[in-house]
Regions:
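Vicinal oxygen chelate
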Residues: 16, 66-114
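Conserved catalytic-core motifs of GNAT/GCN5-like acyltransferases
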Residues: 30-35, 92-95, 120-122
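Short acidic/glycine-enriched loop/turn segments that link adjacent beta-strands
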Residues: 36-39, 60-61, 98-101
Length: 124
């Protein structure tokens, strides 16, 4: 088993409103949604989701985060943990909508870059 394709990329921004205008209105990247009460905006660039966010708490702060799609987030997390990967959190739901629930769990590569596993699961 291996992680799937990159499904999402996170870019830290200093001004979310200005960045949304730039990516949506100047570059024309299709806007998906903002998270109410959170400094986050999401776009769809072909098969890859782009996540713009104002820096988070220190343990999650990173200039870039790669998100890897997986068909079973729990099994893949267990496999990677068996390979010595230390996770920063447990798999958890980050968004619910008509398409289902978006689950994530975060870890780091050897240089400290943030990586995540993602899975869209049926709502329920």
């Amino acid at each position: 088993m291996a992680v799937g394709a990159v499904s999402q990329i996170h870019v830290s921004v200093s001004d979310l409103e200005a960045s949304v205008r730039f990516y949506r209105d100047v570059l024309g990247v299709p806007f998906l949604f903002e998270v109410p009460g959170q400094p986050m905006a999401f776009f769809q660039s072909g098969p890859v989701r782009l996540y713009l966010g104002v820096p988070e708490p220190p343990e999650f702060a990173s200039k870039v985060t790669l998100y890897f799609a997986t068909s079973d987030i729990f099994a893949e997390r267990e496999r990677l943990a068996g390979e010595g990967v230390a996770f920063l959190d447990e798999p958890h739901v980050v968004n619910r909508d008509a398409g289902g629930e978006l689950w994530m769990t975060f870890f780091r590569d050897p240089d400290g870059h943030h990586l995540a596993l993602t899975q869209t699961r049926p709502a329920g």
